[in-house]
């Protein structure tokens, strides 16, 4: 049996061609024929999330920069990235960073770590993001800014001390 052939999305040059592909593929997705520029763009419109008004629908998703300090605090690169989140215009910062809750749960030795010692430095990340957002968009621009923090434990994928440590599959030798 041969695998089905799918057209490359880039080959669908018009809205009509894309719509015909969706119909042929029985994919019930509606879309606008023309993209609207802000402020008319649907992505530029506010949205309510759990009773909180978020200023637009642009979102920064959690990521691991692998650029924290060995102690788990933000580095200059981490702070720079968070300032850029602030000036991006996105109003939903959904995690910003994957932050380990325990040393042994860090995915790598440079992942941020939330402890009593690192908490003030991590709180300053948020402050820098809000400050850069205000500088770019005005002093009241953070009223509809929604910021969260993704707390993680990497489980069996944790590598808190070295970058490439082999794991023993079984403690019993064969």
Model-inferred region functions:
Residues 137-145:
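Short helix-terminating capping/connector loops at secondary-structure junctions
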Residues 60, 85, 89, 149:
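Conserved, mostly hydrophobic/aromatic
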Residues 92-120, 151-163:
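Glycine-rich, proline-tolerant flexible connector loops at the mouths of alpha/beta enzymes
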Residues 144-148, 152-174:
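Non-globular sequence segments
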Residues 53, 64, 153-155:
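Short, flexible loop/turn elements at secondary-structure junctions
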Residues 1-50, 65-71:
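An N-cap/entry alpha-helix motif that binds or orients negatively charged groups
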Residues 66-87, 111-132, 141, 158-164:
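Glycine-rich anion/phosphate-binding loops
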Residues 52-61, 91-98:
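N-terminal glycine-rich anion-binding loops that anchor highly charged ligand groups
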